[in-house]
Every structure is written in C-alpha cells, then in structure tokens.
Regions:
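Metabolite-binding pocket within alpha/beta catalytic cores that recognizes anionic/polar moieties
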Residues: 1-143, 147-148, 203
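Flexible, glycine/charged-enriched surface loops at secondary-structure junctions
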Residues: 50-54, 158-163, 248
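Active-site rim beta-loop-alpha module in soluble metabolic enzymes
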Residues: 139-184
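Generic non-transmembrane alpha-helical segments
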Residues: 148-156, 200, 240-248
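Short pre-catalytic strand/loop immediately N-terminal to key active-site residues, enriched for Gly-Thr
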Residues: 187-189
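Zn-dependent metallopeptidase/amidohydrolase metal-coordination segment
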Residues: 195-230
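His/Asp/Glu-rich mid-to-C-terminal helical/loop segments that flank catalytic regions of hydrolases
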Residues: 218-248
Length: 248
C-alpha cells in the first residue's frame, strides 16, 4: 500500500547524478505557479539563469533574481504534489536554497472563512502520493512555519485565516463525500501541492513558508470558478512573498 512507502534506506541515485556538484548561490527561493507572475518577475527584476530542471518533455529554467537587494531563486513550478516536490529537490541542488516560499490558488471549502482573506495552512490532508515517500504515514502533515507566516501577515496588517487544508492529486475527484469529510475535520481549502512539498522539506531539513488565495468556491449550491483567474495571477501574492523573504 502507498502508506507503506516510507523507506529511509540508502537511495540508488540522486541529484548529483543528473546535475553534477551542488551550487550554493542563495538561501531563499520562490516557488511560482502563475505564468503571469513569473513573466512579471522576469520583466521587472534583474536576474541570471543559473540552471535548469531537465526532463524529456521540456526544460524549466531556474533563475536567481535581485529583488530589493536580496538574492532570491525562482522558477515556474510544475503542478501537482509529485512534480512540485521533485522541482524543489532539483532547485535546492542547482541554487543551494533551503528556504522556500510557496504561494498559489486554492479552492474554498468554507467561503465564510476564506473570502477576502489569505489562507495560511496549519496542516494538510495527505491525499496524494509523494508525501508517503518522505514522511511516515499519517492522515495529516503539519505545516511547521504556519505561525511564522501568520505573524508576518499580522505585522503587515493583511487579512488572513489559519486552518487545515486538503492536498489532492485528483482535481476531478473532489467529491461531495470527501468535501464533507474534510470540512468536518476543519479543512477550509483544497489545493494540489502542499502535503508533498512540506514532506520533502521536512525530510531534507529545509524550511517551507506557504500561503494561499482561494479562487473557486466549493461550498455553494453551484460550483463558482469566477475568482480563480485572479487568485492564480494577482500580483499581490508576489509582493507578500517578497515581504516574507525579508523576514526569514
């Protein structure tokens, strides 16, 4: 079973086999999911391409940006827990980054709590596969830096809500029964990367700082996707991530 997948024995190969010696260029990295935000970063900030995540279906360039005097790595992440978690491992090797700021959109399970607020996850339900290779089995994984992120949002006087979230691999299998079960357990949003990326960071001793903006709404009589584009691409998330980078 997938829940038996955690095995801390020696690996057969690793990042060095694909990329050579590790680079040490910066400590902080932004995990970007929005193509529009990433294009804005490339247009706005001085940057240098320092490597690339390479696979048979394409190349993902990795950059180090100069943002307000800080050296911050950044790249356009693949979607989904397994791919996003693999990207983090590769980018650590290519840049030396050990502090990852990840932000993106989510679906709201409780619009009364999330509307008009940033969501700061405290735990994530592990309905994906990657986390079980990097952490012992459990229903939830703790998002360890939630209190740190919360303190930064409060300092910046940004509206926010703490809560559990649900990480799924199956975007078209968010069913009514699962919705009800997760909401009963206290989940307020659903997304596709956090549990796996948090497990990877915990395994290697790296830090993850995550926040979300809800776009589509699942707790209404009719599924509402009207806010998703803004949740994906609004630049306010980038500016918040920069403020987090200043403080970690």
């Amino acid at each position: 079973m997938i829940t038996d997948a955690f095995d801390n024995s020696e690996v057969l190969f690793g990042t060095k086999d694909f990329y050579g010696e590790q680079k040490h260029l910066c400590d902080n990295c932004m995990i970007i999911f929005s193509e529009k935000i990433f294009e804005y970063m490339l247009d706005t900030y001085e940057h240098q391409e320092v490597g690339a995540i390479r696979c048979c279906n394409g190349i993902t360039p990795v950059y180090v940006f100069d943002i307000e005097g800080m050296k911050i790595a950044g790249y356009l992440s693949h979607i989904g827990s397994a791919l996003a978690g693999g990207d983090v491992i590769d980018v650590n090797w290519l840049t030396g980054a050990v502090k990852f700021i990840m932000f993106g959109s989510a679906g709201s399970l409780d619009s009364g709590l999330t509307t008009g607020k940033f969501v700061i996850p405290t735990h994530s339900y592990r309905e994906e596969g990657l986390s079980y290779h990097y952490a012992p089995p459990a229903d939830y994984i703790e998002v360890k830096n939630a209190k740190t992120v919360k303190a930064i949002f409060d300092e910046l006087k940004l509206p926010n809500v703490l809560g559990k979230v649900w990480t799924t691999d199956a975007i078209y299998r968010e069913t009514k029964a699962k919705f009800d079960a997760r909401k009963k357990e206290g989940c307020i949003a659903v997304e596709m990367e956090l549990a796996g990326v948090q497990a990877v960071c915990d395994f290697y001793g790296w830090e993850l700082y995550n926040f979300l903006v809800t776009g589509d709404v699942l707790d209404q009589a009719v599924y509402d996707v009207s806010g998703l584009a803004d949740a994906n691409h609004n630049m306010d998330k980038l500016y918040v991530a920069i403020e987090i980078a200043k403080r970690i």
